[in-house]
């Protein structure tokens, strides 16, 4: 039973949308997952990554109630599917013969979709920008866990532009790394020498298409100054 429950939690974690995560030097941009990270509601008060945001409105409380019901139904469905898979696996291991139709495993894409997050919990609410000396979340500057100030309108626009350019830059860097690793190990031909006859392999590795002009790493916003 514990194994099934663990599988349910893993399925939920992998099915859920991935949080944004960027890094640049001493800066980390992350949506945060697990524990007090992300959105948490207790006593009708909304928290994001451990920081109190506000009280939920009446309509948002109803939205939360509906979400809790959908999550319960989703967990029950995933648990039932995993239980059926476990029973089929036990039957195979015990040597029982079953018809092909009976032993056909459920594909991952056939798993139920997790419920959509409530409208009051968005990526803008949970994304954190860690700079050298401070952190920005929800257009608010924090020093440690202490609220310092709100970003002004110009700083908000600067942060949006930085995030946009940094995303493009990191995607380019990621492709460069993939290409270098592929060239280093010779693509599929390298691994085929271990798992088959290399001379019979016809698969070739196509290098990722990279932009002719590499994007520049964006300048880091100066929202705080660390004194060394």
Curated annotation (Swiss-Prot):
GO terms for molecular function: aspartic-type endopeptidase inhibitor activity. It holds the Pfam family Pepsin-I3. Residues 88-112 have a biased composition (Basic and acidic residues). It comes from the Eukaryota. Disulfide bonds join 134-224. It is found in: Secreted. This is Aspartyl protease inhibitor. It comes from Trichostrongylus colubriformis (Black scour worm).
């Amino acid at each position: 039973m514990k194994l099934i429950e663990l599988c349910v939690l893993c399925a939920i974690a992998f099915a859920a949308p991935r949080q944004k995560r960027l890094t640049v030097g001493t800066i980390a941009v992350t949506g945060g997952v697990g524990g007090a990270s992300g959105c948490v509601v207790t006593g009708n008060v909304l928290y994001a990554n451990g920081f109190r945001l506000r009280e939920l409105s009446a309509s948002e409380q109803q939205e939360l109630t509906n979400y809790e019901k959908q999550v319960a139904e989703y967990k029950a469905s995933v648990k039932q599917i995993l239980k059926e898979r476990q029973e089929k696996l036990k039957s195979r291991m015990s040597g029982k013969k079953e018809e092909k139709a009976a032993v056909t495993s459920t594909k991952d894409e056939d798993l139920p979709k997790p419920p959509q997050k409530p409208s009051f919990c968005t990526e803008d609410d949970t994304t954190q920008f860690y700079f050298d000396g401070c952190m920005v979340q929800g257009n608010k500057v924090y020093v440690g866990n202490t609220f310092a100030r709100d970003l002004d309108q110009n700083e908000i626009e600067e942060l949006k532009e930085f995030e946009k350019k940094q995303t493009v830059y990191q995607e380019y860097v990621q492709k460069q790394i993939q290409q270098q690793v592929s060239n280093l190990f010779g693509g599929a031909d390298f691994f085929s020498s271990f798992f088959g006859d290399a001379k019979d392999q016809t698969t070739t590795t196509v290098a990722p298409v990279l932009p002719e002009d590499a994007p520049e790493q964006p300048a880091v916003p100066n929202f705080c100054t660390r004194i060394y």
